[in-house]
Swiss-Prot record:
The keyword Cytoplasm applies. One of its GO terms (molecular function) is copper ion binding. TRNA binds at residues 45, 105, 127. The lineage of its organism: Eukaryota, Metazoa, Chordata, Craniata, Vertebrata. The modification Pyrrolidone carboxylic acid is found at residue 25. Residues 1-24 form the signal peptide. The active site is at 37 (proton acceptor), 138 (proton donor). It is found in: Secreted; Nucleus; Nucleus, Nucleolus; Cytoplasm, Stress granule. This is Angiogenin. Has weak tRNA ribonuclease activity by itself due to partial autoinhibition by its C-terminus, which folds into a short alpha-helix that partially occludes the substrate-binding site. In absence of stress, the ribonuclease activity is inhibited by RNH1 in the cytoplasm. In response to stress, dissociates from RNH1 in the cytoplasm and associates with cytoplasmic ribosomes with vacant A-sites: ribosomes directly activate the tRNA ribonuclease activity of ANG by refolding the C-terminal alpha-helix. In response to stress, the angiogenic activity of ANG is inhibited by RNH1 in the nucleus. Disulfide bonds join 50-105, 63-116, 81-131. SMART domains: RNAse_Pc (SM00092). Pfam families: RnaseA. It comes from the Eukaryota.
Length: 146
């Protein structure tokens, strides 16, 4: 009986040891999403903004073809993954119920290597995201028609 209890405790403790990395991995995908796509209060939304943000966010080696920055409150973006600000959309995606202010940066020129030059398109759009554990982890670019 004591040996069985000891084995149970060992398995239980090992299970606890495995839980935090899983949660940390989920949060890291969300943090990566924010790094690539979130800028709460942009300073200008022109070509220079795109070139600066793409460089600062590490998206220019090689030059990323297209990237969208979402502006505003991150809680509203998170809410797309629930019923508060999101609806199901196609396969395993969610679409926002309300539009977001966004800046889409499109690569100009043919070279994928720096210096990267971008053209900015600013506007308001509903956004489509993939969610894991109620957090956005991927922005579906196909919804945007700059």
């Amino acid at each position: 009986m004591v040996m069985g209890l000891g084995l149970f405790l060992l398995v239980f403790m090992l299970g606890l040891g495995l839980t935090p990395p899983t949660l940390a991995q989920d949060n890291s995908r969300y943090r990566d999403f924010l790094t690539k796509h979130y800028d709460a209060t942009p300073q200008g939304r022109n070509d220079r903004y795109c070139e600066s943000m793409m460089r600062r966010r590490g998206l220019t080696s090689p030059c990323k073809d297209i990237n969208t920055f979402i502006h505003g409150n991150s809680r509203h973006i998170k809410a797309i993954c629930g019923d508060e600000n999101g609806n199901p959309y196609r396969e395993n995606l969610r679409i926002s119920k309300s539009p977001f202010q966004v800046t889409t940066c499109n690569l100009r020129g043919g070279s994928p290597w720096p210096p990267c030059r971008y053209r900015a398109t600013a506007g308001f759009r509903n956004i489509v995201v993939a969610c894991e554990n109620d957090l956005p982890v991927h922005l579906d670019q196909s919804i945007f028609h700059p």
